[in-house]
Curated annotation (Swiss-Prot):
It catalyses: L-tyrosyl-[protein] + ATP = O-phospho-L-tyrosyl-[protein] + ADP + H(+). Belongs to the protein kinase superfamily. Tyr protein kinase family. SRC subfamily. It comes from the Viruses. This is Tyrosine-protein kinase transforming protein Src. InterPro entries: Kinase-like_dom_sf, Non-receptor_tyrosine_kinases, Prot_kinase_dom, Protein_kinase_ATP_BS, Ser-Thr/Tyr_kinase_cat_dom, SH2, SH2_dom_sf, SH3-like_dom_sf. Its EC number is 2.7.10.2. It comes from Avian sarcoma virus (strain rASV1441). The lineage of its organism: Viruses, Riboviria, Pararnavirae, Artverviricota, Revtraviricetes. The phosphorylated form is termed pp60v-src. This phosphoprotein, required for both the initiation and the maintenance of neoplastic transformation, is a protein kinase that catalyzes the phosphorylation of tyrosine residues in vitro. Residues 148-245 form the SH2 domain. The modification Phosphotyrosine is found at Y416. A lipid is attached at G2 (N-myristoyl glycine).
Length: 526
């Protein structure tokens, strides 16, 4: 991916301002420049493709006008048809006395699967019995048990995994097709000097007789046979299949069975990662076994009763692009225990050493991940209230996840609840939310537009040179930030859609996610 060269324009023509023409603007950005297209040595290589200009209902970044289906990347299937023998997809080390350790490939007899995310299982290898995470296993002799089968992961996630520059040509996975029910898709990494590393997708169709094929001249009775054949012969594919796409273990749903309100003594705070107005963030260990992130809140920040009630809702929000809430210590000082993200906050990541290597394709991809998580929040009728780069966390391979959703409304600090106090993030907040307290998913959309400027400026504070009071006044009178340097006009226009005065005229996160799809992926038969 890359950006298109913008025609020289007067900077005033690059703004989506609603101010009168004679208004004085502060902190304007210079006109767009062509970004450096040299990919960083430790980031995904992507072919250079141009960003199109905006038209009515545009496909800004090579995407569709409808979003990808977002599903959890769990590969394990539920018990069906009386199947009780499962195979382990990953290694698992027990975290409590009631857990069962097992190795990848181990066969397990499910004793009782009515326990939600944790099933009681008996190992046919060790003879031991205990609870296991249900998303770490799949029915024996099923397609889900194949290492190359990734199930309902999105097309976008398959591309992110395959575009790792360490993957050799021909690295592949099989997933469910998002466009045709009952069909599958073979996704394969390819490379050439003109396009660089790219991904090709081949639809696997199903015969009425039960067989499978990519081209009708070569048919197979099973997906396993299809994969075995194309591992030996390219036969029309971009390359023969070489390596199964590597992937990391999924997060378990919770720390363990019945581990929600946990004792403070079960947590060890080890490395302080950051500090804010309302508390600290630590890397730590739960129960001496499990790496976690721990957010400690200063006493008085919020009511423990209100927090626990909100946390019950938050823990039900599960999506691959949301930081998972694992457990809580509900007595003051409140502790919030979540999955650990190794690269810290997006804001620090952008401003740090790695930020200088990020190019526009990676930044757009990160924006798309955030939009994906927020599209789920949107579907769940939830509101974040504090969406900004400081509340996005980064993991390995530039994975981004939305954090701290819903906590903002519980804060009781006067400097925050006044909405114009020193601690309130006024520069990220929609006018109707800042002035009248009307926080909705549409005010989150406004904040996402501001977050896009943080991405494209590598963490620069929005509205440079302006104080909070001036920002609120100018925005209310129609001012909108101009296009940042090296940002394509099409992306700036997307920001401006997020900053429309009428909240109902702002786009949905589903729409934003679709517009931010990568232009680096080549379409083949899907």
């Amino acid at each position: 991916m890359g950006s298109s060269k913008s025609k020289p324009k007067d900077p005033s023509q690059r703004r989506c301002s609603l101010e009168p023409p004679d208004s004085t603007h502060h902190g304007g950005f210079p006109a767009s420049q062509t970004p450096n297209k040299t990919a960083a040595p430790d980031t995904h290589r992507t072919p250079s493709r141009s960003f199109g200009t905006v038209a009515t209902e545009p496909k800004l970044f090579g995407g569709f006008n409808t979003s990808d289906t977002v599903t959890s990347p769990q590969r394990a299937g539920a018990l069906a048809g009386g199947v009780t023998t499962f195979v382990a997809l990953y290694d698992y080390e027990s975290r409590t006395e009631t857990d069962l350790s097992f190795k990848k490939g181990e066969r397990l007899q499910i004793v009782n699967n009515t326990e939600g995310d944790w099933w009681l299982a008996h190992s046919l290898t060790t003879g031991q019995t205990g609870y296991i995470p249900s998303n770490y296993v799949a029915p024996s002799d099923s397609i889900q048990a194949e290492e190359w089968y990734f199930g309902k992961i999105t097309r976008r996630e398959s591309e992110r995994l395959l575009l790792n520059p360490e993957n050799p040509r021909g690295t592949f996975l099989v997933r469910e097709s998002e466009t045709t029910k009952g069909a599958y898709c073979l996704s394969v990494s390819d490379f050439d000097n003109a396009k660089g590393l790219n991904v090709k997708h081949y639809k696997i169709r199903k015969l009425d007789s039960g067989g499978f094929y990519i081209t009708s001249r070569t048919q197979f009775s099973s997906l396993q046979q299809l994969v075995a054949y194309y591992s030996k012969h390219a036969d029309g594919l971009c390359h023969r299949l070489t390596n199964v796409c590597p992937t990391s273990k999924p997060q378990t749903q919770g720390l363990a069975k019945d581990a929600w309100e946990i004792p403070r003594e079960s947590l060890r705070l080890e490395v302080k990662l950051g500090q804010g107005c309302f508390g600290e963030v630590w890397m730590g260990t739960w129960n001496g076994t499990t790496r976690v992130a721990i957010k400690t809140l200063k006493p008085g920040t919020m009511s423990p009763e209100a927090f626990l009630q909100e946390a019950q809702v938050m823990k039900k929000l599960r999506h691959e692009k949301l930081v998972q809430l694992y457990a809580v210590v509900s007595e003051e000082p409140i502790y919030i225990v979540t999955e650990y993200m190794s690269k810290g906050s997006l804001l620090d990541f952008l401003k740090g050493e790695m930020g200088k290597y990020l190019r526009l394709p990676q930044l757009v991809d990160m924006a798309a991940q955030i939009a994906s998580g927020m599209a789920y929040v949107e579907r769940m009728n939830y509101v974040h209230r504090d969406l900004r780069a400081a509340n996005i966390l980064v993991g390995e391979n530039l994975v981004c996840k939305v954090a701290d959703f819903g906590l903002a409304r519980l804060i009781e600090d006067n400097e925050y609840t006044a909405r114009q106090g020193a601690k309130f993030p006024i520069k990220w907040t929609a006018p109707e939310a800042a002035l009248y307290g009307r926080f909705t998913i549409k005010s989150d959309v406004w904040s996402f537009g501001i977050l896009l400027t943080e991405l494209t400026t590598k963490g620069r504070v929005p509205y440079p040179g302006m104080g909070n009071g001036e920002v609120l006044d100018r925005v209310e009178r129609g001012y909108r930030m101009p296009c940042p340097p090296e940002c394509p006009e099409s992306l700036h226009d997307l920001m401006c859609q997020c900053w429309r005065r009428d909240p109902e005229e702002r786009p949905t996160f589903e729409y934003l996610q679709a517009q931010l799809l990568p232009a680096c992926v080549l379409e083949v038969a899907e």
